[in-house]
């Protein structure tokens, strides 16, 4: 018994029929196209993650700058009140 109730002989017969219908060159081309599509998908996913990381870093820098500005204004306020 093979996959899902299909025996190994049935799988071999289907493989032979596919080879006869499409030929090896066309199957190689399809395999290459499929590999290229998978590679492109993975690249797009990693690019998306990199963009998300850059956005998070920019947000952290913005928050840090706002905190520094708030600290500076508080310090100036203290100086003016001390006078």
Curated annotation (Swiss-Prot):
Membrane protein topology class: Single-pass membrane protein
* Residue ranges of the region described as Disordered: 50-83
Subcellular location per the Swiss-Prot or TrEMBL entry? Cell inner membrane
Give the domain of life: Bacteria
One annotated GO biological process: protein transport by the Tat complex
Per its record, what are the GO molecular function terms? protein transmembrane transporter activity
| Keywords on record | Cell inner membrane, Cell membrane, Membrane, Protein transport, Translocation, Transmembrane, Transmembrane helix, Transport
Q: Does the keyword Repeat apply?
A: no
Bilayer-spanning residue ranges: 2-22
Which segments show compositional bias classed as Basic and acidic residues? 50-65, 74-83
Q: Name one GO cellular component term.
A: TAT protein transport complex
Kindly give the InterPro entries that the UniProt entry links to this protein. TatA/B/E (IPR003369), TatA/E (IPR006312)
Which family does the record assign? Belongs to the TatA/E family.
Subunit record text:
The Tat system comprises two distinct complexes: a TatABC complex, containing multiple copies of TatA, TatB and TatC subunits, and a separate TatA complex, containing only TatA subunits. Substrates initially bind to the TatABC complex, which probably triggers association of the separate TatA complex to form the active translocon.
Record function comment: Part of the twin-arginine translocation (Tat) system that transports large folded proteins containing a characteristic twin-arginine motif in their signal peptide across membranes. TatA could form the protein-conducting channel of the Tat system.
Q: What is this protein called?
A: Sec-independent protein translocase protein TatA
Gene behind this protein: tatA
